[in-house]
Amino acid sequence: MTAEIDPPAYTLVFNPATNSTPNTVAEFQKALEKGSDETKIEAMKEILVTMLEGNPLPEMLMHIIRFVMPSKNKKLKKLLYFYWEIVPKLDQDGKLRHEMILVCNAIQHDLQHPNEFIRGNTLRFLTKLREPELLEQMVPSTLACLEYRHAYVRKYAILAVLSIYKVSEHLLPDAKEIINTFLLAETDPICKRNAFLGLSELDRDNALQYLQDNIDDIESLDPLLQAAFVQFIRKDAIQTPALKSQYCDLLLELLASATADEVVFETALALTILSGNQTVLIKAVSKMIDLAVKVSDNNVKIIVLDRIQDINERNPGCLEELTLDILRVLNAEDIDVRSKALTIAMDLVTSRNIEDVVQLLKKELQTTVINNEKEKSSDYRSLLIKTIRGIAVRFEEIAANIVSLLLDFITDLNSVAANGVIAFVKDVVELYPQLRSNILENLIAKLESVNSAKAYRGALWILGEYSTTESEIQDSWKHIRQSIGEIPILQTELKNQRKSQDEDDEATEESATKQAGPVILPDGTYATENAFGSSNNDNKKKLVENENRPPLRRFVLGGDFYTASILASTIVKLVLRFEKVSERAAVLNALKAEGLLMLVSIIRVGESSIVEKNIDEDSQERITTAIAILMDESNPDESSAERELLNIAFLDATKASFKGQFVAQKKTKLFKSSPVRKHKEAIDQSVSFRLLQENDNTAVSGDAIDEDLQLAIRGDAARDTSSIAISKLKKIVPLTGFSDPVYAEACITTNQFDVVLDVLLVNQTKETLKNFHVQFATLGDLKIVENPPATNVVPHGFHRVSVTVKVSSADTGVIFGNIIYDGGHGQDARYVILNDVHVDLMDYIKPAKTDDESFRTMWNAFEWENKISVKSKLPSLHAYLDELIKGTNMGVLTPVESLGEKDCRFLCCNLYARSSFGEDALANLCIELDPNTEQVVGYVRIRSKGQGLALSLGDRVALIAKQNNKVIVGHV
């Protein structure tokens, strides 16, 4: 019986001469026949690259045997063995080529070469051979190398023995005994490690016996052998659960004494796989944290943290006491490492350690403010604020302290971070009503130093919605009045400008009265004078004046009248609420009068020339509406009804909307983070009893590390193991018609980075098709690895070929080709054109999630945009959104509660997806119902870093329309 062997691994080789014209076979032959060793080396490199690109170069085999194989040059010999790896060793009938007999003799001589490096390189080459006819002649020489004096030879010899046995057991029927004997007698650690790996794969009982014999000395063994022991224990414990407890004790001892980083990581990982005991998990994860702190490679840090996150998800609640230890990783400079550590710590925070965590994060936040000039300091600060926000919302006891902490830093934060702080304050005042009074007091005290208009608008909304008592309303009003500054704004600013102009004129007159001519310094030299000094001084003066202005006045004079419109709404809310909670009519009238004065002053200054940008129509309309509400003196019979409508619009509706949105978001977060949801099982899932089940591998949980390895190799295809036959039937594409002389169909299998075409060819004629071959070519970022070789197909015969197409991006790709075979009786070759195969873009696009800040950053950074106008006869806006999500495979970032009701007439949302190649795709949907035609009209804007992905997704939107026959799409 032939042992199962792994498929060969391929190496990606960079071709440095892609733009040059490739050499012909004759040129290669001439270079090998008459060139020097250096010329032969360059020729061999080009030959290897050419063969790896799909051209087998069969004419070169004899020339290489004649002119390269006898050479003594070490570099040439190394390239020669690379050539032996990839050269076709079998003919079309599947038999060994005659030329390979000469190659076998040369390999045997190298196995007996006095140079140990040549022997070792030759033995390593044997591990890559899969032809029993070739290996059969190498067995005696390979066994002789097991006793060679140099360990470099022996370490490859034992691997060659293992490889030969896996290819064909009858070549080395006693391989298990050979490896076991070699292991017992060997002293070199690398050789012992290779031998033990081979023994554990072929003979589990002897490997276990060797492990038991060395248990007492395991702490002093070489790290390579220790790692091999850990690998064996991890796999064997899954197959023999009865030994798990003993294995765990052994691994704990090894974990405590191991010094090599690799052994520590592998041992800790094995413990977390074999045991769910909290004590064991804490010891293992503690070692992993120490490793993440100690190593300098950021990739290693992220790998270790990923493993810790997986452990925490599989064992919720077991790692809580390690929260502060994980935060030690924040000493790293890489933002991705810090983000991963904070994400894990967020899941581990409890009421017992919350205060310590907040204190540590506070120190980190202070450090970012002190080291503000450092690169990525602002990104890290935003990350810390986001983490602190998430913690405070969960724990009421520290929410007030955290609000005060973040408001203390708001002056030093950029616009995005400051807006995040205000959004957090908004959540806290809604979630914890008992803290509102103190939070409003702190907020009002810190608003004077806020420089971000967006953050200030959020603060105004908070003041308008949550100032509910008479004293709170008056405090908020005082701040607004101080923030506006002296009013009327226009007259005050003009007065200040005239005063400043007078001072400048006086200074000019004084300078004019001074003696003209050069200025002589005390040392007798002439002083220099900057011709631009006066203009620079003017700019500095204006900048200082702008900074000294209060916030609202600065925003208004800067042309930010959107903030002014928010101020107008806030003033109306404060007046209406004061009217409800207070009976002091004089104070109410004073508030109305002062509010009118502020709003009218803003409109007047917005229409003047002293602002940087005049007021826009929308903002002016909103401010005018607020003025009309404050001046309302309508019919007393209608005043109660109108007042009720105003109260609903300004005091109840917006707050109720925010509260509903907040509750919905909270429910969504709780549902997503629920441990029950993460570890749920089907209600009808069968219960497995180990003592009653048959001795097969189907009931045993797999090795998590091996599963991760399969995911890395095959991508998401490794997950989809169910209904393989059904899924393959859906992927069959006809390449020719039934009336063609050759019928062809392809089964398309999509992997993470390639597409495999399994093509079935049927000769429908009564003649033998000679020199029959299939040729494929591609359009787009696709590349054919190798076209299938020519063959002969008998009448009504079948032939199968497999073609691998490498995919390097998520752009639309097309595979086309033809079938060529010789015509009969001296006729020309005949062709059959194949149908085009379109690579499905959706196989490489996956829905993803990101925060609003990252989405906006990418939206501004990406330069390629595809804007598509939409007209649809679908019944609702949500129906079109569902079709778009289904067709583009993108995820919606906008919260569900913000999308509106099912019968809404306007819908705007953001969508996001990532490709298997790390490409980001952003989309913005903005649609509405046309009041005349009741059709869905609007735009879809798609942005990406590269042009191809944006165009491909745009084509996908158009394709959805054609398939649906309900949507009419036009490109802009």
From Swiss-Prot:
Query: Which Pfam families has this protein been placed in?
Result: Adaptin_N, Coatamer_beta_C, Coatomer_b_Cpla
Cysteine pairs forming cystine bridges in this chain are none
Q: Which GO terms describe its molecular function?
A: structural molecule activity
The compartments listed are: Cytoplasm; Golgi apparatus membrane; Cytoplasmic vesicle, COPI-coated vesicle membrane
Q: Per the record, GO CC terms?
A: COPI vesicle coat; Golgi membrane
Return the InterPro entries for the record: ARM-like, ARM-type_fold, Clathrin/coatomer_adapt-like_N, Coatomer_bsu_C, COPB1, COPB1_appendage_platform_dom
Q: How does it sit in the membrane?
A: Peripheral membrane protein
Chain residue ranges for the region called Disordered: 494-522
Q: Which GO terms fall under biological process for this protein? A: endoplasmic reticulum to Golgi vesicle-mediated transport; intra-Golgi vesicle-mediated transport; intracellular mRNA localization; intracellular protein transport
Keywords for the protein's UniProt record, in alphabetical order: Cytoplasm, Cytoplasmic vesicle, ER-Golgi transport, Golgi apparatus, Membrane, Protein transport, Repeat, Transport
Q: Where are the HEAT repeats?
A: 79-113, 133-170, 317-354, 397-434, 481-518
- What role does this protein play? The coatomer is a cytosolic protein complex that binds to dilysine motifs and reversibly associates with Golgi non-clathrin-coated vesicles, which further mediate biosynthetic protein transport from the ER, via the Golgi up to the trans Golgi network. Coatomer complex is required for budding from Golgi membranes, and is essential for the retrograde Golgi-to-ER transport of dilysine-tagged proteins.
On assembly, the entry states: Oligomeric complex that consists of at least the alpha, beta, beta', gamma, delta, epsilon and zeta subunits.
Q: What is the recorded name of this protein?
A: Coatomer subunit beta
